[in-house]
Amino acid sequence: MKSFFLVVTILALTLPFLGAEVQNQEQPTCFEKVERLLNEKTVKYFPIQFVQSRYPSYGINYYQHRLAVPINNQFIPYPNYAKPVAIRLHAQIPQCQALPNIDPPTVERRPRPRPSFIAIPPKKTQDKTVNPAINTVATVEPPVIPTAEPAVNTVVIAEASSEFITTSTPETTTVQITSTEI
C-alpha cells in the first residue's frame, strides 16, 4: 500500500514537468529579426530529492552520484532541480554582428611578478683579498650574578617582652666573577 501511494505521489509530482513545456525567455541577439534563429529545446528535470525527503523508507543518499552522460539528455532523471538549459543545433548560425562588451571588469587584476624580478643578481668577484684590520681578540666582560643572603632581624614587642619574633628577609648583593679565558 505504501508503494502504491509512493508511485501515485511520484507521478503527481512529475506529470506537470513532463507535460508542460517551459518557454525560453532568452532575447534574440538580432533586433532586425523577431523570429527565433535557432531551434531551441528545454531540458526537463525530475524532482527525486523531494520524494526521498518525504519518504524515509528510501533512505538518505549522502553521496551524489555523477552520471556519465551529457547533462542535456532529457530522458535521464536528475536528483536536483536545475534551470532549464537551451540546446542549440550547430547547423543554424546567426548572421548578426556581436555587440561590444561595454561593462568594465569588476575585479581588479594584479600584475604577476616576473622571474627576473624574483631572481637574485650574481655576486661580483673581487680581485684582491682584503684582510680586515680589526682586533679579533675580544675582551670578555664578566657577567654580574646577584646572590641572595638571608639576614636575621629581631623585633621586640613592647607588650610581650619575653617573646622575640624573628623574620628573615633576603638581601641582594652583587659579586663579580672574573675569568682569564680569551
UniProtKB/Swiss-Prot annotation:
Disulphide connectivity of cysteines: none
Modified residues (Phosphoserine): 161, 179
Signal peptide: 1-20
Coarse class of the protein's main subcellular location: secreted
UniProt record similarity statement: Belongs to the kappa-casein family.
Function per UniProt: Kappa-casein stabilizes micelle formation, preventing casein precipitation in milk.
Protein name: Kappa-casein
Source species: Camelus dromedarius (Dromedary)
Gene (UniProt): CSN3
